[in-house]
Amino acid sequence: MESGPKMLAPICLVENNNEQLLVNQQAIQILEKISQPVVVVAIVGLYRTGKSYLMNHLAGQNHGFPLGSTVQSETKGIWMWCVPHPSKPNHTLVLLDTEGLGDVEKGDPKNDSWIFALAVLLCSTFIYNSMSTINHQALEQLHYVTELTELIKAKSSPRPDGVDDSTEFVSFFPDFIWTVRDFTLELKLNGHPITEDEYLENALKLIQGNNPRVQTSNLPRECIRRFFPKRKCFIFDRPTNDKDLLANIEKVSEKQLDPKFQEQTNIFSSYIFTHARTKTLREGIIVTGNRLGTLAVTYVEAVNSGAVPCLENAVITLAQRENSAAVQRAADYYSQQMAQRVKFPTDTLQELLDMHAACEREAIAIFMEHSFKDENQEFQKKFMETTMNKKGDFLLQNEESSVQYCQAKLNELSKGLMESISAGSFSVPGGHKLYMETKERIEQDYWQVPRKGVKAKEVFQRFLESQVVIEESILQSDKALTDREKAVAVDRAKKEAAEKEQELLKQKLQEQQQQMEAQDKSLKENIAQLKQKLQMEREQLLREQIMMLEHTQKVQNDWLHEGFKKKYEEMNAEISQFKRMIDITKNDDTPWIARTLDKLADELTAVLSAPAKLIGHGVKGVSSLFKKHKLPF
């Protein structure tokens, strides 16, 4: 779905059947095909409050998510609708509509809490939908937010400093939007007009008092303010006062609805399309459709096993799958590019190695782009090994191509020579001189042939070796030569053969040196790109930590200004810990990166430093090539 999904209607993503949550595999298959980044908008709220209408409007449809026209809740579980994003190219908008909270027909109310928590975990923009006003009752109905500390974990194990795990929610929680339907009040505070956002923030202020009822009432307010740093509010008038139209609102054209409601709905939709963020995990990991599917499966499996969905565990699960795919993607890219760019046989080994270096550099960049949380660079090492093996295949293919091409040319050039030998044309007085002149012409013509490849000398050397016995026979039978002249000719032939063997050995040593230099270059390129990635990840981590600190400080200062000194003081330990984390990230980056790079260098050197392994592969391969393509001479 690179060009964007074409879902004509929503599909259930998480089924809620008999108090059991199940992931719908058909929905996962749809997400698997979406490799684009996703903007995920989820809506939750009490049943029969018009959530589905808003989501249909975001999808640009009158109908889709079931609206229902009775007091029964229509939506069960979490439903999904993937549509091309209207304003972000190459992004998919994923709309999640959840079953109504507080439905008396449902059995275990715990499922409401899980649906709420899953929506928070899966989306990048979280919409809470309620009716009439944000008052004490509305906030009490939002008690699900207070349960998130029991239903979601950031880390798989408790923090050693004892600071609550929920302090890190702010680093990965979605933006929060409260939509208030059928709003009839005036937006005023103490006689002065206020904005919708100011209305929400005023409603979220804590109430003074220490009795249990006040504390219970304050808890949802406190959780929203602490967990969701970016908050927004939209109010909506009643769509129409006509009960018949309301009962069939999915069939009603917008023109039949209240103009003010239309305007408010359009403003809301425009905000979502413009400001709803791409879904990301901690440290800036971008979520695509297929990654979203993996997250959904991981979280629901955790719920069904009796565990608490944990972001850290989910990211590890996701990384295992994604990094394996990144290895394959990068290796495939390398193979495709080499196949496209290399014309076999290459004139020199260096030409092939330069092409390899360019394709490998691009493939490493692809691996880096699509991998994350590669603990101990396990997958990078797999990628390196895979690329090294593929490079070996290309080297062998290059050698084989060179052998075939050179043999074909030599067959062609030596055809006359072989026919003359068979006809006994050189078995005459002066035949040796004639034979040598013919052979020298073949050699001159052979070296004039362009792009013979890396085995040109070796193939010709084999040709010369095949002629040794023939030349000896012609020489000894040539009655025009004296014994001394024959002896001189034999010595000259041996000397020339030794020189050519020396040239061949020199070429092999040079190629071995080129291969070792190429391996060293490959190692340095891998380390350079890893270093850049580690530095970027550290910068992203630092930004997240600073954001968490600044948000926590803002909440703390708000408590103080609102007269809650005890709450202000309770947050000191939290803030101190954030500052320590930031100091560690700032000051310990160089040793940490250096240690990682040194370790990788050692391990990759072990992988790559098989010059004998790779070069031996080449040398061994040559003898097998000659067996495979036997010389006719």
UniProtKB/Swiss-Prot annotation:
EC code(s) of this entry: 3.6.5.-
Ranges of residues in domain GB1/RHD3-type G: 35-277
Catalytic reactions of this protein: GTP + H2O = GDP + phosphate + H(+)
UniProt keyword Nucleotide-binding, yes or no: yes
GO biological process annotation, one example: immune response
Family: Belongs to the TRAFAC class dynamin-like GTPase superfamily. GB1/RHD3 GTPase family. GB1 subfamily.
Pfam families the UniProt entry points to: GBP (PF02263), GBP_C (PF02841)
PANTHER family per the UniProt record, alphabetical: GUANYLATE BINDING PROTEIN
CDD domains reported for this sequence: GBP, GBP_C
Major subcellular location class: cytoplasm
Name of this protein: Guanylate-binding protein 6
GO molecular function terms noted in the UniProt entry: GTP binding; GTPase activity
SUPFAM superfamilies (alphabetical): Interferon-induced guanylate-binding protein 1 (GBP1), C-terminal domain, P-loop containing nucleoside triphosphate hydrolases
Region GTPase domain (Globular): start-end pairs: 1-310
Functional note: Interferon (IFN)-inducible GTPase that plays important roles in innate immunity against a diverse range of bacterial, viral and protozoan pathogens, such as bacterial pathogens Listeria monocytogenes and Mycobacterium bovis BCG as well as the protozoan pathogen Toxoplasma gondii. Confers protection to several pathogens, including the bacterial pathogens Listeria monocytogenes and Mycobacterium bovis BCG as well as the protozoan pathogen Toxoplasma gondii.
Organism domain of life: Eukaryota
The keyword Hydrolase is annotated on this UniProt entry: yes
Keywords, sorted A to Z: Antimicrobial, Cytoplasmic vesicle, GTP-binding, Hydrolase, Immunity, Innate immunity, Nucleotide-binding
Gene Ontology CC terms: cytoplasmic vesicle
Signal peptide span: none
Location(s) in or outside the cell: Cytoplasmic vesicle
Phylogenetic lineage: Eukaryota, Metazoa, Chordata, Craniata, Vertebrata
